[in-house]
């Protein structure tokens, strides 16, 4: 009986470690997705100062580190812009639609990543 309890506890511990590794992998995946698709305009730190943004750039990309502004945006609003592009939300046509390029799970990871950058939650809805 004691052996069975030890085996069960050991399995539970390894299961939790596996879950933690999965969450870590998801976070790393979201950061890599951000770096690949977003950082060119928004910058690695999400401040809207990526390498593609020059003095001649016609718009200023959103500063994801601005908690006051980011907290006004719902996750659904952000999802819409990422999936369908800027014009879908009356924003810049320079923000491309990524919905046919990255998965919905990746978009959800990006939203969590953006919330981590701003250290804020979005408005409901």
Name what the model sees in each region.
Residues 41-48, 65, 97-100:
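Detector for the c-type heme attachment site
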Residues 16-35, 125:
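Electrostatic cytochrome c docking/interface patches
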Residues 47-77:
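Gly/Gly-Pro-rich "capping" loops immediately C-terminal to redox-active cysteine motifs
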Residues 8-18:
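Bacterial N-terminal signal peptides
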Residues 37-44, 110-114:
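The canonical Cys-X-X-Cys-His
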Residues 1-7:
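Positively charged n-region of N-terminal signal peptides that target proteins for export
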Residues 60-62, 81-108, 117, 122-125:
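Axial heme c-ligation environment in periplasmic c-type cytochrome domains
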Residues 29, 33-36, 73, 77, ...:
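Extracytoplasmic/secreted proteins, especially bacterial periplasmic and envelope-associated proteins
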């Amino acid at each position: 009986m004691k052996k069975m309890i030890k085996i069960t506890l050991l399995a539970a511990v390894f299961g939790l470690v596996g879950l933690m590794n999965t969450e870590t992998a998801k976070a790393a995946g979201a950061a890599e997705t951000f770096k690949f698709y977003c950082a060119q305009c928004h910058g690695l730190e999400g401040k809207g100062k990526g390498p593609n943004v020059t003095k001649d750039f016609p718009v200023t990309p959103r500063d994801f580190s601005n908690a006051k502004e980011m907290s006004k945006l719902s996750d659904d609003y952000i999802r819409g812009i990422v999936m369908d592009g800027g014009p879908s939300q009356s924003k810049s046509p320079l923000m491309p639609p990524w919905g046919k390029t990255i998965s919905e799970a990746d978009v959800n990871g990006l939203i969590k990543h953006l919330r981590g950058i701003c250290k804020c939650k979005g408005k409901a809805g």
